[in-house]
Design a protein with these regions (language model features):
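Short, surface-exposed polybasic-and-hydrophobic patches located at secondary-structure transitions
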Residues: 61-68, 142
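Long amphipathic alpha-helical segments
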Residues: 49-57, 129-144
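Helix-loop segments that flank and shape redox-cofactor active sites
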Residues: 10-36, 101-110
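Alpha-helical transition-metal enzyme core signature, strongest for iron centers
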Residues: 4-15, 34-48, 88, 92-96, ...
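Conserved alpha-helical segments that form or flank metal/cofactor-binding pockets of metalloenzymes
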Residues: 26-64
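N-terminal non-cleavable signal-anchor helices
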Residues: 7, 11, 78, 139-142
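Acidic/histidine-rich alpha-helical segments that form the ligand environment
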Residues: 65-122, 126-127
């Protein structure tokens, strides 16, 4: 389950990369898109409380543990991609895969499945928006 928290963190970092590397005529649209994609509501808190505290009766991973795992995950997601929007799309795709794998686990209780469904729904919407933007005939966003 920590993989979901790590993948969300990576998506947030990638959205920040897009946010701060967008210039030119599409600046504001990309800026707003990046802000929207960072919003997973209370998903992280819900997972920590619903899964670790509620189901496992143990403390959730610390922010430090999540951040350390996210650093290497970030490097894997961005490998070979030089455009922030392509990186964000890769991060969202990875998050979707991670969540879908966990959703197939029948041993998880209904509350955890509901949390994963919410993350999955947001991920699907954000993936659609980012993919649509990446296919527009606009100047590419260059990373620095």
């Amino acid at each position: 389950m920590i993989d979901v928290l790590v993948a969300i963190e990576v998506v947030k970092w990638l959205a920040s990369d897009l946010h701060y590397n967008s210039t030119g005529p599409m600046f504001y649209a990309l800026h707003l898109l990046a802000d929207r994609v960072k919003d997973f509501g209370s998903a992280e808190d819900d997972l920590k409380e619903g899964y670790w505290l509620g189901c496992l009766d143990t403390t959730p991973p610390s922010d430090r543990e999540i951040a350390n795992a996210a650093i290497s995950a970030y490097d894997k997601v961005v490998d070979g991609k030089d455009c922030p929007i392509a990186r964000l799309l890769a991060g969202l795709t990875n998050l979707g895969v991670v969540v879908d794998e966990l959703k197939s686990d029948a041993s998880l209780n209904g509350g955890v499945h509901a949390i994963l469904d919410d993350i999955s729904n947001r991920t699907n919407v954000y993936t659609f928006l980012v993919r649509a933007q990446s296919q527009q005939n606009v100047p590419p966003v260059q990373s620095k």
